Structures are given as structure tokens and as C-alpha cells.
Amino acid sequence: PYITTNTLTRDCDTGIQNMGVYRTMVRNETSVVCNLTPGRQGYRNTLTWTNKDKVAPIAWAIAAPPAVHLATVAQLPYGVDEITLAGGMMGEAVNVVKCRTVDLLVPADAEIIIEGEIHPGETEMEGPFGEFAGFMGPVERRPVVRITAITHRRNPIYYGYTSQMPPSESTTIQSLTNAGIMLKMLRHDLGEIAVSDVFIDLTFAGMLGHAVIAMKPGYPGHSKKVGRLVAAMSPIKRVTVVDEDIDIRDHTHVEWAMNSRYNPSRDTVLIDDAYFPINMDPSVRS
């Protein structure tokens, strides 16, 4: 059995928390193995403890408010707490409470909270698991978590993300959340007001997926600049930039634009040696 919902960790140096989805294999009644993948924020947070020979705190919030689940899959800059994003979506702060046995804040309205500790050097093989990309995730050595507490409501509701051959629940919420974040970053943070819309396909979604950007270029090469920005800000594998008259959610319309306006030799930009911090894509593993 697996836990497939919100995982919370904390940076030992800054105190900033991270919330993400890291599949977690139930090992026995008192321990699990968490797929904290190198390069992702939960993994980095854990290292800030274990590299100092300290025990790292970790927790799972099962069946939290919907905005919390949406924020969990967001590809946010390192150091930004996803619970803050969830509060923005809700229009009010997320109620949080301190865990009983570890130093973490978790959503108070979650149905179930599982608390645990990661001790330096304790690892075990984890996997395989049917992942959001439609492939079996690989078996690799990952941290063992000693469970320290489980709290829950009376008659709690259990919830987990459904990952299967895409599109799935998992890829759909990744697409919605990360497209919105990408549009906000382009228009408001980077000043690219020529960008009018962003869509991320429902196959690999926010992780290694295909982003389609609609914009009105202001000068020659403007669309290539925006494409590079998108490639740099997230683990997106492909970026297609089209004019704003194209319905980017209509695959046929996008293909029409590609066939009628795209010149491969002139309009293709390849970025060599790009690193994607995820091992669910067979082309990355090969």
C-alpha cells in the first residue's frame, strides 16, 4: 500500500516548510519509505537535517481542504510555502496546528495527520509504483521514516491522488495549478504582459510536460525569449509559443497554427543538457 497525498518537510536552516507529493510505501505498522527524489524541495529540506547528523521531521496531511491539495502540486520557487498559496486560493489563511511529536505545522482541517522522523543513513528500496506519467516508477533506495504519531477525526475520510495512464486526476490538477502559476510569473513577476494565456497538457502536466503559451510578440525574437523563460522556471520539457488568436486548449487549433506558421529550421530552439529533477520519464532514465 501507498500514501499518495500531501507530504510536509521543513528546512533546518530557514525554518521554511515545503509541501509536495512524494509517493510513500508502507513498510510495516511503524515505518514507511518515502520517495524523496534528489533535486526536489522535500529532498533538499531533509538533507539540511541529515547532513548535520540530525533527525529530519516529516508529516502527511490526508484529506485536507481542496485548495491545499491544489497548492501541493504547484512548482513554486524554493523557499515559498505552499500553504501560503493555498490561503491565497481560499481568500483566507489556512488553519494550521503544530504536530504532536515533530516540529511542523500542518493543516488543522485535514482528516488524518501522520507524523514521522527520518534518521541519517536509514534507507531502503522503494517501488515500483504506477505513476502519473503512465509508467511504473523505478525501484530505488529512499529514506525510511519512523512513524511517531497518527491523529485523525472521528470516522476520518481517507484520500489519495489517483495516478494512472494520463489524463488522470493527478495530471489534471497539476496542469491547472502550474499553468496559473506560470501565467502569474510571466505577466506579473517578469513583466511579460504580452503573454495572454498558458496551458499545460494533461499527459505529464506540470512535470516534464508540454506548455503552450499564447502571446502577442512585441519584437522579433520575443516569443523565443518567453519560451526560454518558461523552460528555465519549471521542469517543462517542451514549450510551444503561438499567437494570441490561437485557442491553446484546442489541440487541433494548435496543430493548425504549427502547420501553417511554424518553420522548423527557423523557429526551433534546443536547450542542451537540461536537468529534470524527476525519474518518472523513461527518456530521462535512459
Provide a role label for each language-model segment.
Residues P1-A61:
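Internal mixed beta-strand/loop scaffold within catalytic domains of large alpha/beta enzymes
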Residues P65-S286:
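Charged, compositionally biased interaction regions
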